[in-house]
Amino acid sequence: MPFELIERAQQRCRQRLAQAFDAFCGDDARQSRLELRDPEQLPSHERVRLPYEDGEFDWVACHELIETFGGHERQVRLLRELLRIARRGIFVSTPNRGHPLVRWMYPERHARLHDALTIKTMVDVLPGRPVWKLGHVRLAGFKSHYFLMVWKDAAAHPAQHAEPAPQADRPAGGTEPPSAAWRPR
């Protein structure tokens, strides 16, 4: 019974992550593309090197894997390697270490699970200072998973192509610049 509940929760998380990815970047994301191979098949050597050419894929997805890659430095190396093989960017999801169900499901890797601050510190040291955005998915009212989008080219970021907000939406004040609290939709 408890395992069925866990399986249903994981399936729901996968579906919500696929929907979030689809809405977040506008590409056609399917759950089958978010499936991982058996973690036992992953290379165990310290150097993270994937057998692909530079920029071989448009987008690279890494679903609930980064937290299994040892310490912080090795996880940063994994992010760098994912960026190397991606032309446009990467999508990374990871369980939130603050979610009670996640702590119960993964007690052996709880110390390596992430929160928003640890994800930010990893992205801040990536080469080229890429554009990135961090989001989350809620399960039972708690942030259960974080998802990270990193664009290699700032010009490809969706915000670079957004239409300016209509003049009627801007705050009153004539030619004064908008306040720091105001942002176009």
Positions of the model-derived regions?
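Alpha-helix C-terminal capping/helix-to-coil transition sites in glycosyltransferase folds
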Residues: 56-57
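A short, conserved alpha-helix within the catalytic core of class I
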Residues: 69-81, 94
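Short glycine-dipeptide loop
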Residues: 85-90
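Solvent-exposed polar/charged
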Residues: 83-84, 124
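Class I (Rossmann-like) S-adenosyl-L-methionine-dependent methyltransferase catalytic domain
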Residues: 1-51, 77, 91-185
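A conserved beta-strand element that flanks and buttresses the S-adenosyl-L-methionine
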Residues: 61
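Short catalytic micro-motifs in class I SAM-dependent methyltransferases
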Residues: 64-68
